[in-house]
From Swiss-Prot:
It comes from the Eukaryota. It is found in: Mitochondrion intermembrane space. GO terms for cellular component: mitochondrial intermembrane space; mitochondrion. It comes from Homo sapiens (Human). This is Coiled-coil-helix-coiled-coil-helix domain-containing protein 7. Pfam families: COX6B. It is linked to A chromosomal aberration involving CHCHD7 is found in salivary gland pleiomorphic adenomas, the most common benign epithelial tumors of the salivary gland. Translocation t(6;8)(p21.3-22;q13) with PLAG1. Its main location: mitochondrion. A motif (Cx9C motif 1) lies at residues 16-26.
Length: 85
């Protein structure tokens, strides 16, 4: 597996791995009919938007690493109360 692909499959790097997998699985199950999977795509897009805002906030505050680890993301989601996307 190429290193870029491995990085994208790493839960510490990609916070939206489950959303990405769900949208790909939907495409596979629905014969690549994009209209049927639009809710999955929207959820993935909202996930990326949410975590990007967290990265920007951490960068602004000088917190490193900019992308929280998987454990930190779980804490953030618990603090929010539920998945905001």
């Amino acid at each position: 597996m190429p290193s870029v692909t491995q990085r994208l499959r790493d839960p510490d790097i990609n916070p939206c791995l489950s959303e990405s997998d769900a949208s790909t699985r939907c495409l596979d199950e629905n014969n690549y009919d994009r209209e049927r999977c639009s809710t999955y795509f929207l959820r993935y897009k909202n996930c990326r938007r949410f975590w990007n805002s967290i990265v920007m906030q951490r960068r602004k505050n000088g917190v490193k690493p900019f992308m929280p680890t998987a454990a930190e993301r779980d804490e953030i989601l618990r603090a929010v109360g539920n998945m905001p996307y």
